[in-house]
């Protein structure tokens, strides 16, 4: 019995090697799991559920096959795929999670999230996030022709790359006090998230001497990064792209 967690694959037609590894993972590993959690940034950028491309259908097909074979799949939106919506969920069978979700892992209560909201020192990003998550703005964006949305997204991606070059690694990492605050909010001793691309298992001792665990998922840029969680053990492993 085990549950799988992945995040930050940044799937794109530009990186067929990552796509191939993802498909292999879905068909050979995810199919054997009790459940699969995708904690954001599955896509390098998801323009909208109306994406007509062969690439988008290819990815949706993998999820559809997995869920139709009885493996529950849960999806947390990241900062690159926050436009994943109900249509995507209906077409794939995945269950969309809120930004912060409490789950039961073999008797262990845990909070799962993408992780971007933990980076409270990155105020410019959080301001941007607040704007693009406004429902009216997302509805307006959804009404635009797909080709125009592609152009706007390319501009946004360029701005994001430029902005990251001027930020320190500390600003783009989580704020420890925010991590503790979220864990206290949900009364949990385990947190699992992605976003920072710094895979690790951290032990945290709080002021009341409670020992908590924060598991950070890795990205898939150079190799597949997967967390296998069972009742006895949490194991990170990486696999080279085929």
From Swiss-Prot:
Binds 2 Mn(2+) ions per subunit in a binuclear metal center. One of its GO terms (cellular component) is cytoplasm. Pathway: Glycolipid biosynthesis; lipid IV(A) biosynthesis; lipid IV(A) from (3R)-3-hydroxytetradecanoyl-[acyl-carrier-protein] and UDP-N-acetyl-alpha-D-glucosamine: step 4/6. It comes from Vibrio cholerae serotype O1 (strain ATCC 39315 / El Tor Inaba N16961). It is an enzyme of class 3 (hydrolase). It is found in: Cell inner membrane. This is UDP-2,3-diacylglucosamine hydrolase. Its cofactor is Mn(2+). Mn(2+) 1 binds at residues 8, 10, 41, 197. Mn(2+) 2 binds at residues 41, 79, 114, 195. InterPro entries: Calcineurin-like_PHP_ApaH, LpxH-like, Metallo-depent_PP-like, UDP-diacylglucosamine_Hdrlase. GO terms for molecular function: manganese ion binding; UDP-2,3-diacylglucosamine hydrolase activity. Substrate binds at residues 79-80, 122, 164, 167, 195. The keyword 4Fe-4S does not apply.
């Amino acid at each position: 019995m085990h549950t799988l967690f992945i995040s930050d694959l940044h799937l794109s037609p530009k990186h067929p090697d990552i796509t191939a590894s993802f498909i292999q993972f879905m068909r050979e590993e995810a199919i054997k799991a009790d459940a699969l959690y995708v904690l954001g940034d599955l896509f390098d950028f998801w323009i909208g559920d109306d994406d007509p491309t062969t690439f988008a259908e290819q990815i949706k097909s993998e999820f559809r096959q997995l869920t139709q074979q009885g493996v529950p799949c849960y999806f947390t939106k990241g900062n690159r795929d926050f436009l994943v919506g109900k249509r995507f969920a209906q077409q794939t069978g995945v269950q969309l999670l809120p930004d912060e979700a409490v789950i039961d892992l073999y008797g262990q209560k845990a909070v799962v999230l993408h992780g971007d909201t933990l980076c409270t020192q990155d105020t410019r990003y959080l301001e941007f996030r607040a704007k693009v998550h406004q429902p009216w703005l997302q509805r307006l964006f959804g009404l635009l022709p797909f080709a125009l949305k592609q152009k706007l997204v390319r501009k946004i991606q360029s701005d994001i790359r430029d902005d990251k070059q001027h930020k320190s690694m500390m600003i783009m990492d989580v704020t420890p006090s925010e991590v503790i605050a979220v864990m206290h909010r949900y009364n949990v001793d385990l947190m699992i998230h992605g976003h920072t691309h710094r895979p690790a298992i951290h032990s945290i001792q709080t002021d009341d001497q409670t020992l908590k665990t924060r598991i950070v998922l890795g990205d898939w840029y150079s190799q597949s990064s997967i967390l296998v969680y069972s009742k006895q053990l949490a194991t990170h492993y990486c696999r080279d792209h085929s």
